[in-house]
A protein has these predicted regions:
Chain A
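Periplasmic/extracellular loop-to-transmembrane helix junction in inner-membrane transport proteins
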Residues: 9-32, 47-90, 109, 254-266
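Membrane-embedded alpha-helices of multi-pass transport/permease systems
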Residues: 42, 94-101, 130-133, 151, ...
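Interhelical loop and adjacent transmembrane-helix boundary motif
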Residues: 68, 72, 224-276
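Transmembrane-helix boundary motif in ABC transporter permease subunits
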Residues: 88-120, 133, 286-292
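Generic hydrophobic transmembrane alpha-helix motif, especially the helices
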Residues: 121-157
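Glycine/proline-centered hinge or cleavage motifs at structural transition points of membrane proteins
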Residues: 127, 186-187, 200
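C-terminal transmembrane helix and the adjacent membrane-cytosol boundary/short C-terminal tail
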Residues: 169, 173, 211, 250-298
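Transmembrane alpha-helices
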Residues: 190-228
Length: 298, 322, 285
């Protein structure tokens, strides 16, 4: 670049024509690459949804899986997915939020707390298979309960805990100081301030976090294969926490790997479509209230 | 405490006094309310501290469990053999994990080589170039990509990507670190680009204005002002993406070939730490050296990802001091 | 932790109520009670689940929880007392290549599982001798032209160590010779499904799997001029098959015994078991 040698004239004043060319090239380039990637993503989503969605029936979604005949459903696996997601969220969201609130609001700035932060981030980066191994060590070897829903759900909760913590902390930190001070000035206690001012303001970030966590938990397979097994109890609406807890993502894996039903390919296509569709719904459903809220506050 | 007891005695006193009931009740409730609020505040804070400690506890118990089982490996296998030998054939009692350690690093590096430039371009596009409606559409779509189960990615890799690679390059198999890196790129792309996008978006408006005022084009502004200013945020995204690439299991295992040999070519079937663990963990006897060695590999993975976090922290501190 | 305890108690209470409602509607055909936990081989899982469904209809008070991780987890779980039945693809009361025997466990044959060597559709060779198979899987023969095919590299696809299919194939088809463990044209897969996809989509590939999984998109080769068919297994000419076993700690009793007896009954063996494309144990002389 010529500009580097002509120091006094500043770093940007080089050959104007060249710059314009570069700029156009750059814009073109960025648009091009982005368009390619976006097209690719859309093609990917289309590929998954188009293979499965058109042939979806209610019987498939609610039906019991079959081991030898065509037409088995995914009912119990789908139910387990939601059930385990719910349990893991029940554990991870309150704990994660409180830990996040602590880090954002109460924690003093010292070595111990920065160590705690490293722990949270460290836990967030732990590979999911490690949570699976940990789940085996904890539930299969220590408590000897075998492969169960509760084992899977707790392992999932551990997986989600740090993400929840971090997201809450960030969201609460992003709330303007004025808001907090105004609340204190009105005589509110710290808890009241957190409940009535901080959390409602930070809810958008927190909900995005829950959304992220729920999506991840819903699609997770390695942890669940190791801790909750690859089978269901074969009954619909089985709330027993000690039943084996195959989820839809695991069922997808199982059907591709071991099942000998003749329509395994179509089951896995449909399961994949259902999975992606549900995650899509999570994203939309969680966001709609936020959009409405945003509109209102405007 | 002293205050509370005095309040109590005061209340006791008023019980028998001649004062009107309304005052008595009123003051009582006031004080109750204060105590109650104090109590709620305290217990809430304690609950918060407990939750934060719980998160740390989980990490340490994971570290402890993995280490406790993993370290038993070294009863039967010398440490140097485990870390530096390339011979992994547990059925003949050789436990050299170097192939997997090397594979993990090679795969991660290759993934980053492909995904970082692409992600940054996408991030720049979303934050600086794209019109607002497109941005609002793109962000949820990228978030959605994070949620697609890795099994699905793996299956698409196995059925679409590998035959494609085989046809393009004319190799025999197509399995190997290149295939795995491409699949991983798709998986970490949303993570890196979303975080970089956020980092670029929060670069203060005035930086850009100043740059434009000096006569810079958009290209120059982005590359010389915006991206350097967002550097630490982008680094954070890259390292998170890296952590995901290192830890990904189900997608990698389907396309990497799972052969314990050194990944010295793009299309050579090889194996990484995660894929080897998941391939073998359910097929080894409990309490065997083999099982312990797999846990040791898990512990290694854990240490690698923790080191990376410490790296992020250092980077962030450097960013803050700047 | 306390939260999770209360939660689990609450959920269990709900589950109890739910099961008592559904339980009362089913006819009390049998007085058999208990809980059976099955763990182990994933290849036997479809069989176990199907049998469990039918058995539960006959004995509504028996709860069966079946799961699978890998063959070796079956007898291991039994030894640890986590499972009552360990499903395994080989007789775990004996030593097999790679695995020691489990003392004090009783093996019950439940099915005959035929295995087939399969190749991609583009492979022209359709008959392999035991010697040729041994050479291919041990890496001595690297090109299809040496075993009667076209001039192309052989891609060997193998199951991961510890797979029951691998143990059986090694014992019955390769007569105990070792597999290669590395090479440019060698890969390992995690499951029967992955094996299927790999052989279907990789030209010049050879692998092996339970006969059940063989599809029209691949080719099952003859071994020593004998086609891998059910009939050939039954008449004793095709040798590459193994029994599926249920391992129990000592002789079983109660519900576990009844369940194993149900699986071994001719009604199940000639009904669902056949439909699942396993071969009844009584068919083998």
């Amino acid at each position: 670049m010529k500009s580097a040698t002509t120091g006094t004239r500043g770093m940007f004043t080089s050959d104007r024509g060249m710059n314009n060319f570069n700029n156009r090239m750059f814009t073109f380039f960025v648009w091009g690459i982005s368009a390619c990637i976006i097209l690719f993503i859309c093609a990917l989503l289309y590929l998954i949804l188009q293979k499965g969605l058109p042939s979806l029936t209610w019987d498939f979604i609610m039906g019991l899986p079959s081991e030898m005949e065509e037409g088995g459903g995914i009912g119990p696996a789908l139910f387990n997915s939601f059930y385990m997601l719910l349990i893991s969220l029940l554990i991870a969201v309150p704990l994660g939020m409180m830990a996040g609130i602590y880090l954002a609001e109460f924690a003093p700035e010292n070595k111990v707390i920065s160590f705690v932060r490293i722990c949270v981030e460290g836990l967030a980066s732990v590979p999911s298979i490690i949570f699976g191994l940990f789940g085996i060590a904890l539930f299969v070897e220590m408590f000897q309960v075998g492969l169960t829903i509760i084992g899977g759900a707790v392992s999932l909760a551990f997986l989600n805990l740090p993400v929840m913590t971090r997201v809450t902390e960030e969201a609460i930190r992003a709330v303007p100081q004025d808001m907090k001070q105004a609340s204190f000035a009105l005589g509110a206690t710290h808890l009241q301030t957190i409940r009535r001012a901080l959390i409602p303001t930070a809810v958008s970030g927190i909900v995005t976090g829950i959304c992220l966590v729920a999506g991840r938990a819903f699609g997770e397979s390695a942890v669940i294969i190791l801790t909750a097994g690859v089978t269901t109890s074969g009954e619909m609406w089985d709330f027993n926490l000690l039943s084996p807890g195959e989820t839809l993502a695991v069922h997808l894996w199982y059907v591709q790997s071991e099942a000998i039903v003749p329509d395994a390919v179509s089951i896995s296509d449909k399961s994949a479509a259902v999975l992606v569709f549900i995650i899509l719904m999570f994203n939309i459903l969680f966001r709609i209230p936020l959009w409405i809220k945003e509109r209102k506050s405007r | 405490m002293q205050l509370e007891t005095s309040v109590q005695s005061l209340k006791m006193g008023t019980e028998e006094s001649e004062l009107g009931g309304s005052i008595k009740a009123g003051s009582g409730r006031m004080l109750d309310r204060k105590n109650r609020l104090l109590f709620y505040n305290r217990s809430f804070k304690i609950a918060c501290i407990a939750s934060a400690s719980f998160v740390c506890l989980v990490l340490f118990s994971i570290l402890f469990f993995m280490f406790r089982t993993g370290v038993l490996t070294f009863r039967d296998v010398p440490m140097a053999t485990f870390f530096f030998s390339t011979d992994w054939s547990p059925e003949n009692e050789s436990y050299g994990a170097f192939v997997f350690i090397f594979g993990t690093f090679a795969l991660t590096l290759l993934t980053l080589l492909i995904s970082v430039p692409l992600s940054i371009i996408i991030a720049v596009f979303m934050a600086e170039v794209a019109p607002k409606w497109m941005r609002n559409l793109l962000r949820p779509v990228l978030d959605l990509l994070v949620g697609i189960p890795s099994v699905v990615y793996g299956f698409l890799g196995l059925t679409i990507l590998i035959p494609l690679l085989r046809n393009i390059t004319g190799t025999n198999m197509g399995d190997g670190i290149l295939a795995a890196a491409i699949v991983l790129t798709i998986m970490v792309l949303p993570t890196i680009s979303r975080i970089s996008d956020d980092a670029i978006s929060v670069v203060p408006r005035k930086y850009r204005d100043a740059s434009y005022a000096l006569g810079a084009t958009r290209f120059q502004t982005i590359f010389k002002v915006t991206i350097p200013a967002a550097r630490s945020g982008i680094m954070y995204g890259v390292i998170l993406g890296m952590a995901r690439a290192i830890g990904e299991t189900m997608a990698v295992v389907m396309v990497i070939g799972n052969t314990p040999q050194l990944a010295d070519a793009l299309f050579k079937p090889t194996s990484v730490l995660t894929s080897n663990i998941v391939m073998q963990i359910s097929n080894v006897p409990f309490d065997s050296t083999w099982n312990n060695a797999l846990y040791m590999m898990g512990f290694l993975l854990l240490v690698i990802s923790l080191l990376m976090i410490v790296l992020v922290r250092l980077l962030q501190q450097k960013g803050a001091h700047r | 932790m306390k939260l999770f305890k209360t939660l689990s108690v609450a959920a269990m209470a709900i589950a109890l109520v739910a099961t008592s409602i559904t339980g009362s509607t089913a006819s009390a055909a049998s007085s058999l009670k208990g809980k059976i936990v099955v763990n182990g081989s994933s290849a036997l899982l479809p069989l176990t689940l199907q049998a469990a469904n039918e058995f539960k209809k006959l004995n509504p008070k028996v709860k069966i929880s079946a799961s699978a991780a890998g063959s070796i987890t079956g007898p291991q779980s039994v030894r640890k007392g986590i499972a009552d039945i360990g499903a395994v693809d080989w007789d775990a009361s004996q030593d097999v290549p790679g695995f020691k025997k489990f003392d004090g466990q009783v093996a019950h044959k439940v099915a005959v599982i035929p295995f087939a060597a399969v190749v991609n559709k583009n492979v022209t060779a359709d008959n392999l001798t035991t010697k040729q198979l041994q050479d291919i899987f041990s890496g001595k023969v690297k090109n299809w032209k040496d075993v009667g095919g076209e001039d192309a590299d052989i891609i060997v696809v193998n199951r991961a160590f510890g797979s029951g299919t691998r143990v059986n194939f090694q014992m019955k088809a390769l007569q105990g010779t070792d597999f290669i463990s590395k090479g440019d044209n060698y890969k390992e897969v995690k499951s029967s499904g992955d094996m299927k996809t790999a052989v279907e989509t990789t030209p010049n590939a050879i692998g092996y799997m339970d006969l059940v999984y063989v599809t029209s998109k691949m080719k099952a080769v003859k071994i020593n001029n004998i086609a891998p068919t059910e009939a050939n297994v039954i008449n004793g000419t095709y040798k590459v098959w193994g029994y599926g076993y249920y391992m129990t700690k000592g002789e079983p009793d109660g519900a576990v015994k009844a369940f194993i007896e149900y699986i071994q009954s001719s009604k199940f063996q000639n009904g669902s078991l056949k439909k699942l494309k396993f071969i009844p144990i009584s068919a083998i002389k």
